[in-house]
């Protein structure tokens, strides 16, 4: 693998992250996200239909202001962590090109892109 393809990989990844950030800053919360944001205001170890992880993520990233961007930024950060993890997994067990392919195939997938900007466990 040459340096140019790695720079292209980084550039494409950054562009996809910027698109996600633009998307979450220009859309309103869906009903479930508003429901989980209410959970974040009243944290508990469990709720009637879900565990506390989504509420904890929203609480962490929405301090001190509870906005739609802050509610969804946790989903974007988790998707970035997943893409980086896939890159290192592919690099460790196969080669660098496989790591790049895994990460880009995940990040560029339209269904993943849409679902990685909505913070719900469903």
Region roles according to the model:
Residues 10, 69, 73-94, 108:
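Transmembrane-helix motifs of polytopic, lipid-linked glycan transferases
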Residues 2-29:
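Transmembrane signal-anchor helices characteristic of membrane glycosylation enzymes that use polyprenol
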Residues 5, 67-69, 93-101:
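Membrane-helix interface segments
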Residues 111, 117-122:
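Short acidic/glycine- and proline-prone juxtamembrane loop motifs at membrane-interface regions
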């Amino acid at each position: 693998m040459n340096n140019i393809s790695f720079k292209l990989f980084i550039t494409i990844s950054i562009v996809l992250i910027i698109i996600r950030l633009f998307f979450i800053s220009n859309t309103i919360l869906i009903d479930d996200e508003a429901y989980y944001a209410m959970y974040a205001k009243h944290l508990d170890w469990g709720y009637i239909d879900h565990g506390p992880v989504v509420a904890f993520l929203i609480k962490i990233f929405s301090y001190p202001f509870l906005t739609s961007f802050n509610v969804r930024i946790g989903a974007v950060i988790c998707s970035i962590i997943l893409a980086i993890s896939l890159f290192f997994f592919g690099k460790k067990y196969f080669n660098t090109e496989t790591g790049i392919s895994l990460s880009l195939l995940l990040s560029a997938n339209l269904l993943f892109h849409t679902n990685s900007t909505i913070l719900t466990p469903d």
